[in-house]
């Protein structure tokens, strides 16, 4: 089984429903993909800072660069990704998390837990305008624990 924590308006501290509790409970045992607010919840749960993004990105496409690890395995860097957010997880990341994707301006677009299958992306792989979105989701669904 897998868990996907999808986007929503608001902040991980106040408007995430059960998302933070789900991450805390399952991150060691079940692969989790956090999208947008889901990534922000991951950053928050592991002690990171979620702050206003330098630019509002509502329905805008921008290049995302990545490390080629995890859900980004086999994908070109950069690729175009659709973004709908006004908040981001800010660097430096907590020690448990590593940066996996970023913008040219240095905004965190992807992160993952160093030990457990807990992965976040700030952009929307499910959007029609995101290149390789299906590949990202396929990589998540086929990755081992």
Segments from the language model and where they lie:
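Catalytic beta-strand/loop cores that center a nucleophilic Ser/Cys/Thr
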Residues: 68-115
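Histidine-centered divalent metal-coordination motifs
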Residues: 36, 85, 124
């Amino acid at each position: 089984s897998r868990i996907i924590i999808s986007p929503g308006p608001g902040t991980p501290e106040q408007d995430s429903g059960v998302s933070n509790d789900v991450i805390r409970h399952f991150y060691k045992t079940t692969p989790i993909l956090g999208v947008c607010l889901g990534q922000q919840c991951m950053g928050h749960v592991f002690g990171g800072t979620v702050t206003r993004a330098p630019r509002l990105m509502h329905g805008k496409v921008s290049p995302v660069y990545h490390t080629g690890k995890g859900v980004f395995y086999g994908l070109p860097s950069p690729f175009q990704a659709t973004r709908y957010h006004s908040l981001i997880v800010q660097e430096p990341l907590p020690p448990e998390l590593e940066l996996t994707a970023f913008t040219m301006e240095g905004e965190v677009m992807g992160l993952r837990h160093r030990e457990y299958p807990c992965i976040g992306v700030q952009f929307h792989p499910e959007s029609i305008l995101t290149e390789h979105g299906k590949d990202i989701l396929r990589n998540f669904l086929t990755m081992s624990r």
